[in-house]
Design a protein with these regions (language model features):
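Structured surface patches comprising rigid loops and adjacent beta-strands/short helices at the edges
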Residues: 372-398
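Conserved, helical-rich catalytic subdomain that frames metal- and/or nucleotide-binding sites
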Residues: 291-354, 359, 388-398
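Nucleotide and nucleotide-moiety/phosphate-recognizing core
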Residues: 163, 185-302
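Short, mixed charged/polar active-site loops
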Residues: 250-253, 351-353, 376
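SH3/SH3-like beta-barrel fold
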Residues: 366-371
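N-terminal lobe of the biotin/lipoate ligase/transferase fold
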Residues: 2-227, 231, 392-398
Length: 398
């Protein structure tokens, strides 16, 4: 039996495995009946020592296991650069020649041009040419950074923002330190579309509304693909403020971070969408198979291209006409019109709970609701709950 010492907080349930674990412990966890993973034992008697040579196959499998458990191993991250036209490809050559791109914590990277890559595609690798051929934007998504495995697409974009063209996108097949709300870190397995891209905005008042435009663009992109391919409509919905749901199960999320420099907000927008991995909940292709016997499957490359094609148009409306011009379309897609929620309101030294009905969004991007007393109010999260609809705080609107 081969063994591996796992780190704390190893709570990931391995597919097709019977897993026994102890949260917040330093023990090794036992994994049995798994076709994909080695068995792990509480004894380390047979574990290879630093002096014990292991072959390449063993090394890769050990690395796969240790990465899944969150161990601190920093391999070289490969970044493949490409562009829609010669102009973007010249930018790619310049970035490579000047060794411009960096990652946090001095993570070692290897930069390669897509035109230099002679390795055949493997498995579910992102197909760059398929994506670029489907892209029809003027700005967004035309410069691409792809990696088979990387800590975080958000880090690639935010750490190199000033050196990248506007609308540049980084997409990864696997990321093992994906960013979430409240600085949560996520491991994103194969089958997910994970990408981040650059946006610059001047009006800070509308930056919080950008995530709504992004989520709307993704739902509309899935509709466009379905219409083009003659597929049944998948009811992809928006859960405020930044999640995507199918059949009451989460399949995606949006994260926007920004910095202010030279009178502009540099926004890094990150999106994760479960396209073809039905664990731990569901994915787009599973939802499609439940609706139709079609052999068609959603492809990450099409979704990314259709997303940018739609986002660029919606973003133009957003900047020039405001979010009000998109509200009707947004409300058709979100989950909350008419939803009744319990909110908290401070009265003197007590916290009183009231039931209100959601009406829409306020100009600042929070929830607009009405109480049983017909008093309009703004709802915002308390920042302590993973569920935005637990612990909502009520503020009266005059």
């Amino acid at each position: 039996m081969l063994t591996l010492l796992c780190c704390r907080n190893f709570s990931k349930v391995l597919r097709d495995s019977k897993v026994s674990y102890r949260r917040d412990s330093r023990y090794i966890f036992s994994v049995v009946n798994s076709p994909s993973f080695w068995s792990l034992s509480k004894t380390i008697a047979s574990a290879p020592t630093p002096e014990t040579p292991i072959n390449e196959r063993e090394r890769k499998r050990l690395f796969s296991l240790s990465s899944a458990s969150g161990m601190d191993i920093s391999p070289i991250c490969a970044l493949v650069l490409s562009g829609k036209t010669a102009a973007e490809n010249e930018t790619a050559k310049l970035l490579k020649r000047n060794d411009t791109l960096k990652l946090p914590d001095d993570t070692e990277i290897s930069v390669l041009l897509h035109s230099e890559r002679d390795k055949p595609l493997e498995g579910n690798e992102f197909r760059i040419d398929l994506y670029l051929n489907a892209l029809s934007t003027d700005t967004f998504g035309r410069f691409l950074i792809w990696s088979p495995r990387i800590p975080s697409t958000q880090d690639v974009i935010s750490h190199n923002f000033s050196n990248l063209p506007l609308g540049a996108v980084c997409v990864a097949d696997v990321q093992f330190k994906g960013r979430g709300r409240s600085k949560n870190l996520w491991e994103s397995p194969p089958g997910c579309l994970m990408f981040s891209f650059t946006i610059q905005m001047e009006d800070g008042r509308i930056v919080p509304l950008l995530q709504y435009v992004i989520s709307l663009a993704m739902t509309e992109a899935i509709k466009d693909i379905s219409n083009e391919e003659g597929l049944p409509y998948i009811d992809l919905k928006i859960k405020w403020p930044n999640d995507l749901y199918v059949n009451d199960l989460k399949v995606g999320g949006i994260l926007c971070t920004s910095t202010y420099r030279s009178k502009k907000f540099n926004v890094t927008a990150g999106i994760g969408l479960n396209v073809d991995n039905d664990e731990p909940s569901t994915c787009l292709n599973e939802a499609l198979s439940n609706l139709s016997s079609t052999p068609y499957k959603f492809r990450k490359e099409d979704i990314l291209a259709f997303f940018f094609n739609k986002f660029e148009r919606l973003y133009d409306v957003f900047i020039n006409q405001g979010f009000r011009a998109l509200e009707d379309l947004y409300y058709q897609t979100w989950l909350h019109s008419g939803q009744r929620v319990i909110v908290q309101e401070k009265k003197e030294d007590q916290v009183v709970e009231n039931v209100v009905t959601i009406q829409g969004l306020t100009s600042s991007g929070y929830l607009l609701a009405i109480g049983d007393d017909n008093q309009m109010c703004e709802l915002h999260p308390d920042g302590n709950s993973l569920d935005f609809f637990k612990g909502l705080i009520k503020s009266k609107l005059v």
